[in-house]
Amino acid sequence: MNTTIRRETLPLLALDDYQLAATRYHAERPQAQLLIAGATGVPQGFYRRFAEHAASRGFNTMTLDYRGIGQSKPDSLRGFEMEYLDWAHLDLAAAVDQHRHAERPLFMIGHSFGGHAFGLLPNHDQVAGFYTFGTGAGWHGWMPKAEQVRVLAMWRVIGPLMTRYKGYLAWSKLGMGEDLPLGVYRQWKRWCRFPRYFFDDPQMPGLAERFTLGDR
């Protein structure tokens, strides 16, 4: 580990003024800015070593916890109201805005949901380049048979029972990551019904065109 990397914990206000937790990893000789957009249910600490490495390579790097996750979650997720898309429209968009006056270009890396999020950003034009990994559709039909059974059991049996009892998806009990707010669970479950994920959702018309044309 490069022990010269200075790490700074900083508050971040989402576009609706929700308080988020973020961390800045300062490069000794910064050449660019980097924003890491995390996966569903993955706290920012998971990306610490990568962020430190990026900073050692000249990127002033920011990580954040989306609302409802990590240090940005309320005392209880029961009754916590939000939508899955808030992570992109309100949280990541605010993180992008944090860099709008920076002298150096901003790049993003998106993991899983973080990869989907780039096409949902209202301020994508502020990003000079974007790399995504581990970003999939989530439809069970693309998966091997054994995985299909596990996924369908999650959506049709385990998830409904767990959310009815808890009021949120106790994801951590399954060793899958952090617990998820009910709104995230419901939208995620809905999108995974479609082969092309949210692009096929009739409640989100024109989304594919907005991704293609950059018209947010």
Q: What is the role of each PLM region?
A:
Residues E81-R100:
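Alpha/beta-hydrolase active-site loop
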Residues F113-H116, Y131-G141:
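Active-site nucleophile loop of the alpha/beta-hydrolase fold
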Residues Q44-L77:
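Conserved alpha/beta-hydrolase
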Residues Q31, I36-V42:
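Active-site glycine-rich loops that stabilize anionic/oxyanionic intermediates
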Residues A117-L121:
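Hydrolases whose catalytic domains are alpha/beta-hydrolase-1, hotdog thioesterase
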Residues R100-S112:
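Alpha/beta-hydrolase fold nucleophile elbow
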Residues M176-R216:
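Serine-hydrolase catalytic core
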